């Protein structure tokens, strides 16, 4: 498998990759899985499945990565499947699948594959993949609209959540004091603050905040995360006259996520470009009423409104009303969230792998999976 980031990484793609590798390694026929991560934002620590070979000597260096990939190709024993965890790595993954003579599976997350790739070679190779795994129906539809890949080759595998790690808890008192949130009504969004992620909806929440204050004098907007777009958002909050109602936490450790979710009365992310949105699952698992967009993959994370409230991010009144409606809901994990549990994810992935492998007469047994992301 060729992948961008996984063990030690932040964000939804890294989380998906970790779950994907664990689920593949639990397949009864998987003797070994080899993963080539491209980057790691943190040190690669922690336990890995016994049958996972996680190649780390080429992290964060393009030339060393290419060398490691080439060395891996030359030393391949019999493998049965090549998985490409990000469309940017498709040329490498395709080369590996051709070399080994095995099927190639591409994983699609979100906007990275909603339109033709800037690399024309990638667009040509896309037509040659044997299967595609998409985290949502939205991403599958957007990908199919330009790629020409047939629907029977495109499988849906939504993200999953650890329902033991993320669970409801009372508000964390030290964090309440640190961020001066005692006796406040807290709206929360968690995500990277970068210009390429402006689709997540930070601006939309800021723009309705003055109107919410008229109804909720103690409301505060908690923005969890960091990035170069932070100064722009701070300036926008000032220009809207709500700077004193917006708290920027900066980057938080993964170990503190649950504690930060506990601070929220509503989790709100009215996005336009989410392929799925793992943060929705995390918030709901922690029992936080959740507001998402009906225009992107967020609606699938909320099971089309079964688990939370859907709004149109282009309609500020709708966003405001969605937040107000969510504040009327009682905290607690919604029924039906176990649809996104890891065991359910594992079963879905095993079924997809069995179908992909059985479709290829030369790949009846999974002896080795090469993962490229």
Over which residues does each language-model region extend?
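Conserved donor-binding/catalytic core segment of Leloir-type glycosyltransferases
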Residues: 2, 181-200, 206-209
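Short His-centered aromatic/hydrophobic patch
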Residues: 84-90
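Short alpha-helical donor nucleotide-sugar binding micro-motif in glycosyltransferases
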Residues: 126, 251-252, 259-264
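Carbohydrate-associated surface elements
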Residues: 138, 160
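Aromatic "clamp/platform" in nucleotide-sugar-dependent glycosyltransferases that forms part
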Residues: 272
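Short hydrophobic beta-strand element within catalytic cores of glycosyltransferases
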Residues: 289-292
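Conserved acidic donor-binding segment of nucleotide-sugar-dependent glycosyltransferases
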Residues: 304-305, 309-316, 325-329
């Amino acid at each position: 498998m060729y992948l961008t980031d996984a063990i030690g990484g932040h964000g939804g793609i890294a989380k998906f990759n970790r779950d994907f590798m664990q689920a593949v390694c639990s397949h009864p026929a998987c003797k070994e899985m080899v993963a080539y991560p491209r980057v790691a934002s943190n040190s690669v620590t922690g336990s890995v499945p016994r049958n996972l070979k996680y190649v780390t000597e080429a992290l964060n260096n393009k030339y060393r990565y290419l060398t490691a990939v080439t060395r891996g190709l030359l030393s391949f024993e019999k493998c049965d499947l090549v998985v490409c965890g990000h469309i940017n790595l498709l040329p490498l993954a395709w080369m590996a699948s051709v070399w080994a003579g095995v099927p190639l599976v591409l994983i699609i997350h979100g906007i990275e594959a909603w339109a033709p790739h800037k690399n024309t070679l990638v667009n040509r190779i896309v037509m040659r993949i044997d299967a595609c795994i998409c985290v949502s129906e939205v991403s599958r539809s957007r990908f199919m609209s330009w790629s020409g890949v047939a629907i029977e080759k495109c499988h849906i595998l939504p993200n999953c959540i650890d329902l033991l790690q993320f669970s409801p808890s009372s508000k964390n008192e030290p964090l309440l004091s640190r961020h001066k949130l005692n006796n406040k009504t807290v709206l929360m969004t968690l995500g990277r603050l970068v210009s390429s992620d402006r689709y997540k909806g930070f601006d939309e929440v800021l723009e309705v905040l003055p109107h919410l204050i008229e109804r909720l004098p103690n409301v505060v907007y908690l923005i969890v995360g960091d990035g170069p777009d932070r100064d722009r958002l701070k300036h926008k909050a000032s220009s809207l006259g709500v700077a004193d109602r917006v708290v920027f936490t900066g980057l938080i450790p993964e170990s503190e996520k649950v504690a930060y979710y506990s601070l929220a009365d509503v989790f709100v992310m009215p996005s336009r470009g989410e392929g799925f949105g793992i943060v929705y699952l995390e918030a709901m698992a922690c029992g936080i009423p959740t507001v998402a967009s009906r225009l992107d993959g967020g609606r699938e994370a909320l099971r089309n409104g079964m688990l939370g409230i859907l709004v149109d991010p282009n309609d500020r009144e709708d966003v405001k009303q969605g937040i107000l409606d969510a504040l009327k809901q009682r905290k607690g994990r919604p029924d039906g969230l176990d649809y996104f549990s890891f065991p359910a994810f594992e079963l879905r992935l095993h079924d997809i792998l069995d179908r992909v492998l059985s479709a290829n007469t030369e790949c009846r047994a999974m002896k080795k999976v090469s993962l490229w992301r």
